[in-house]
A protein has these predicted regions:
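Compact beta-sheet-dominated domain cores in extracellular/mature segments
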Residues: 3-4, 21-137
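Bacterial N-terminal signal peptides
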Residues: 7-16
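N-terminal targeting/docking segments
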Residues: 1-2, 16
Length: 137
């Protein structure tokens, strides 16, 4: 019996340490939102449309500095993991590290942004300079 106690204590301590350092899953940072203008799109929980930029390659961030002020990136807190899937959305979510060290949410590998001039009732920049609303099924 004594021989089992020490290995079990070591195993329990290792499991506890691993759980302390594991990243936690963030709550779904985006939602599927039905609009009259575009149909179903990805949006923030506050119903701001999400965009991708055709100047960026998969998992490569190019919009920084002044660009990121106009097109704020969707970031997730340090130490959390993006959900891989969101109910009702076909596609895969992931993460990319931005040059400033923040973690940005991606959809099918493409970094996600909002537009600073949009409101929940106005989606202003679909198709402007290579920025497109993320339409989903």
């Amino acid at each position: 019996m004594r021989r089992l106690v020490f290995p079990l204590l070591v195993l329990a301590a290792a499991a506890l340490a691993a759980s302390a350092f594991a990243a936690t899953r963030t709550s779904d940072p985006v939602v599927k939102w039905k609009t009259a203008q575009f149909g179903s799109i990805l949006a923030t929980k506050g119903h701001l449309a999400l965009y991708t930029w055709n100047q960026e390659k998969v998992r490569k961030v190019k919009c920084t500095g002044a660009c990121a002020k106009v097109w704020p990136p969707i970031t997730i807190p340090h130490g959390t993991m993006a959900p891989k899937h969101i109910a009702g959305v076909m596609g895969t979510f992931g993460e990319v590290m931005r040059p400033d060290g923040k973690t940005q949410l991606t959809f099918n590998g493409h970094p996600l942004y909002t537009y600073h001039g949009d409101t929940p009732t106005k989606i202003l920049c679909n198709g402007v300079d290579g920025w497109y609303v993320v339409k989903v099924h």
